[in-house]
């Protein structure tokens, strides 16, 4: 326990929390060619690679991912949610934060139904999360 005098001389230091999605906290001013500290909820980027990776133990699957170069120049790995996708190299995508627990190094999700990413086909429930339009009533 510190004494009152010690606290007066050197107060409590609050902990600094690191961001879980640091690429969203950086901007880029292309006119001045400098990085800025402007946070954004989503960012646009171009796919440089699309592929599959295997999850950590004890899970087993082929999870779809894309390597994305963002508008701020940072390259990140983003997960492609849902069944099936239409992404390929040079597709323009929108990413949001949110890690995938069983894929190491994947801290971002691609937003389905935005920009070049199509929504999931034939999805009836939870459509808004997968960019699927409401089916026509028959």
Curated annotation (Swiss-Prot):
Region (Disordered): 33-55
Cystine crosslinks: none
GO terms classed as biological process: translation
Coiled-coil region: none
GO molecular function: rRNA binding; structural constituent of ribosome; tRNA binding
GO cellular component, one term: small ribosomal subunit
Keyword RNA-binding: yes
SUPFAM superfamilies (alphabetical): Nucleic acid-binding proteins
Chain positions found as 3-methylthioaspartic acid: 102
Keywords: Methylation, Ribonucleoprotein, Ribosomal protein, RNA-binding, rRNA-binding, tRNA-binding
Entry superkingdom: Bacteria
PROSITE patterns the record matches: RIBOSOMAL_S12
Family statement: Belongs to the universal ribosomal protein uS12 family.
UniProt subunit comment: Part of the 30S ribosomal subunit. Contacts proteins S8 and S17. May interact with IF1 in the 30S initiation complex.
HAMAP family: Ribosomal_uS12_B
Known role: With S4 and S5 plays an important role in translational accuracy. Interacts with and stabilizes bases of the 16S rRNA that are involved in tRNA selection in the A site and with the mRNA backbone. Located at the interface of the 30S and 50S subunits, it traverses the body of the 30S subunit contacting proteins on the other side and probably holding the rRNA structure together. The combined cluster of proteins S8, S12 and S17 appears to hold together the shoulder and platform of the 30S subunit.
Protein known as: Small ribosomal subunit protein uS12
């Amino acid at each position: 326990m510190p004494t009152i005098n010690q606290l007066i001389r050197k107060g409590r230091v609050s902990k600094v929390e690191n961001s879980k999605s640091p690429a969203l906290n950086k901007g880029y001013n292309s006119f001045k060619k400098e990085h800025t500290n402007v946070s954004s909820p989503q960012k646009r980027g171009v796919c440089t690679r699309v592929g599959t990776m295997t999850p950590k133990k004890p899970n087993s699957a082929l999870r779809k991912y894309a390597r994305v170069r963002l508008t701020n120049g940072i390259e990140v790995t983003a997960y492609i949610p849902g069944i099936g996708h239409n992404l390929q190299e040079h597709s323009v995508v929108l990413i949001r934060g949110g890690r995938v627990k069983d894929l190491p190094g994947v801290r971002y999700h691609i937003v389905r139904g935005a920009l070049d990413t199509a929504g999931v086909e034939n999805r009836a429930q939870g459509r808004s999360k997968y960019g699927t339009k409401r089916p026509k009533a028959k």
